[in-house]
């Protein structure tokens, strides 16, 4: 028997109450789910320490065993399609390091097949960390250690990926993703207008004002 009262259980009843919809995760990268935490760790490590692509000698990636098996097998070091590349930890780490971002643009055929990324992919070493198994799936622990050509070493660990409600994307990061998805469809200017409308949706008097912005000129 369907319990209709369940639909109302624990719903916010005052303006200061917390809405669970705000706890939804958002994929910050268009890649396989288990790749998000290690890529987050690397991007943070690079930014925090001012690491340049040419400075990197090795990127050691510690993840749970299933992530290492699925995302770091030998074939993933030579992706030949978008479908392989977005499930390849070596590719995602390499293109993220070189391009400074991982968006749909990084999975266009010409980028996936770009041979200049091969030496960078070969610097990525994916290993399983048994200690991380105890924390999964509540957490998705990943640790990245970047060794530089100057002999320095930088380590960053994250337990949740960027986009998890415990480490939410910023408005700027959401904007980058939005434009990466929409610019080629409706154009940058239209994307700017649509983004502003969505972020200010509570000010819109009629939903037609919003839907009109989704029509290609």
Where are the language model's segments positioned?
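Terminal-appendage/accessory-domain detector
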Residues: 1-217
């Amino acid at each position: 028997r369907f319990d209709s009262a369940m639909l109302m259980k624990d719903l916010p009843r005052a303006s200061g109450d917390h809405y669970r919809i705000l706890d939804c995760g958002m994929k910050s990268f268009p890649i396989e789910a288990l790749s998000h935490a290690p890529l987050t760790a690397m991007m943070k490590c690079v930014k925090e320490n001012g690491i340049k692509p040419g400075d990197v000698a090795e990127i050691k990636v510690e993840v749970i065993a299933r992530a290492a098996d699925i995302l770091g097998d030998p074939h993933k070091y030579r992706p030949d399609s978008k479908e392989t590349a977005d499930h390849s930890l070596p590719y995602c780490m390499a293109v993220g390091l070189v391009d400074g971002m991982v968006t749909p643009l990084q999975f266009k055929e010409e980028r996936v097949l770009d041979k200049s990324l091969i030496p960078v992919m070969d610097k990525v070493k994916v290993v399983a960390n048994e200690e991380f198994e105890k924390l999964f799936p509540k957490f998705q622990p990943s640790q990245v250690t970047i060794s530089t050509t100057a002999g320095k070493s930088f380590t960053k660990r994250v337990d949740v990926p960027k986009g998890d409600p415990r480490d939410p994307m910023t408005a700027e990061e959401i904007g980058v993703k939005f434009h990466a998805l929409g610019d080629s469809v409706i154009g940058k200017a239209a994307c700017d207008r649509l983004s502003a409308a969505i972020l200010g949706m509570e000010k819109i008097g009629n939903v037609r004002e919003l839907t009109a912005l989704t029509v290609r000129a």
